[in-house]
Amino acid sequence: MRAKKSLARPKKTVIFSNDFYSDMRADGMLYALIVRSPFSAGKINSIQLENQEPIPENYEIFTADDIPNQKFITTFGTRTEIFCTGEIKYKGEPVALIAGPDRKTVFELREKVKIILERKNQNQEESQDFFEERNFEKLPEQTESKKTSELKEPQETSEQKNSENLEETAAEREVLSGDAQSEFKNPENKIIEGIWKNSVTQHEIKETAGCFCCLKGENLHIFTAGRYITHIKDSVSRATGLEKSNIILNCTKKNNQNSNKIWMSSIFAAMASVAALKTGKPVLLSLEREDEINFVERATFVKVKNRAAVSKDGTIKAMDIEIQADTGYKNPLATEMLDRFTIAAAGIYSTENLRIRTKIFSSANPPSSVRLNRIDSQVFFALESQIQKISEETGFTPLEIRLKNLRNSNAKSKISKNPFELELGRAEDSMKAVCARSDFNRKYAVYKLAEKGRYETDENSPYSPPLRGIGMAAAFDGNGYLGTNFKNENFSLQVTMTDERKIVVNTAPPSQNIKEIWQKIIIDSLGIDKRSIQFNLDLSLAEASEKGIAAIQNDLMIGNISIKTHLLKKCLEAIKRKKDAVLPITVKKSIAPSKRNQWKEETFSGTPFFSTSFGTCVVEVEYDSCAFSEQVTGVFAVIDCGRIANPQAAETAAKQAIKKCLSTLVFGDSLKCQKIVVQFAQSDDEPKNLDSLIYSILPPAFCSATSQALALTVNELPLKTDSLFKIKENSEKNKKIKNQETQ
């Protein structure tokens, strides 16, 4: 498609289209690529081609010096440089943009780029070819801390060892409830400890991040899949000096949005805009797949230490939970992660004595990313895995230990002995239902007995039967976090009745099931025809941008379905009251302050979510002791997510989420399962989140099942293809050492 087809004079500075930005073409267009630092530290002296050869005609290298105004963007108070301004902060930091009319030549020129560092001593090399380390090995999940951080699993590179910009605490929070220490000192309590690590991510890359920029008269047109509209326009305006009214934002077909894309889209737009203004030519900046994975979709490494005091009757008397997460260099969403991790750590249990310490580290790594609607899944993995370990060491079944510690599980009751008040819905009924459907109790007992006699000499025979395991997990999913940074757009809704008596709702349903529910609500309320209902996200975002509101596409937000359904009903009630008024009628409703005030940010307590959904699942696995591989033989899930208008569509969506989640659990492999069973708890509550629950309950259930099959603890995800072999190998080595010590 040609870009100029979309460049008709717009009435507004925000336009929406169904195109991909990467398909845009224009006469004289330049292809742009980002030049990244191969160093993790050092001060840049200059950037040039090898042998100091001149750059060819019609090709350009742009650095921070070419930005006419502000050289950084600001996201929630965090400054991020568009290009490195001198001192390198992390390996892979953007230092320049190289652009030219031929994409192949641009790639070749980038290979010749040399970054000259200031010499600090005689032994330090002056420069290094960028492509000498261009094929980045998997970036280390974290680096060693100057302080007492324990996030140092991978080995440091030589550059990281010399770096002065090592790990520092970016944000921390501590939540105390009761007196945990006294319970740990009680000799009658059993102390059970576990360490759990998770860096699972999902690369659903349809179109890589980037943008297309071109000038038309006094206006700069930006085509991007980014949806943080006001942030993009503000960042480009501050960098280029253009008035916001001269920046025409064309929102193309959106790709999968993680937390990094929300703010990195503004950086890419600023880079391409500077190049377009300097050259006067259209510029297409599109990230390579490798860059997308390493720098935009980079997983957040989370480590959780859980120490529990359990009484003889299986009651969890106290928990001491320490969460550590490396979010890379100055992550703008570190505070959002901090809060959600802390809330998730309390889980669905009524532990009276609780201590949660959460630390977010800023390190000399690229900023890590999370899916906003799955932001707490890594902490649920740790908590549910710990519950499974408590079950194994106390002798209670996983269902018994959960029901014994699940407080006040009636439909509308709340957890009272906990700093966070959460509605759990039909949690107890759901867990009993999933265990009955999967025959969990019987299989768990059989597999538990089968652990005896493991690791005989003939175990690795190709004729030996597979080893089996079964695990379960449960979690809540918060719908509409009341402490989020994205409050303005997430907590309001506008509905218009046009002069033709059509209803226009300024939001987009995130699924067909939700769309059908909203349509039925409108029809029942106003009695209009289904064909007269229109969902128009574009208007609300464009209008918000014009008014300077923090407009961001609402389906990126954490669990806004319940909020939007609630506000839709309020808008329709207001329109009914104005039925005799002159058309058109526009009504805008927001969440009542009393509801927002249920969450007390100053004390970090109260009701953190507008509503919560609940899910539980059981996973069965078979372990081939000869091939050291696992196979998922069954997944059973029961979900309480409010009213379901189309059960078949909801079931299909849940099964698709399960399949996608399974594909993330083993690095370099994609687990599959033929037997997937999904049930929904009957409810008249407003609809709530569905697919994000799967990512909180499936991984810990899989890990618990694999641990039982292996008869060894699996405490880290994602697995690698040789992980189970190494776990067993290390176990056998430890056994030999113990046997030698006892002899």
Residue ranges and their predicted role:
Residues M1-E150, E156-D429, V446-Q743:
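Cofactor-binding beta-sheet edge motifs in enzyme active sites
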Residues V434:
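Divalent-cation
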Residues R437-S438:
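Short, basic alpha-helical nucleic acid-contact segments in DNA-binding proteins
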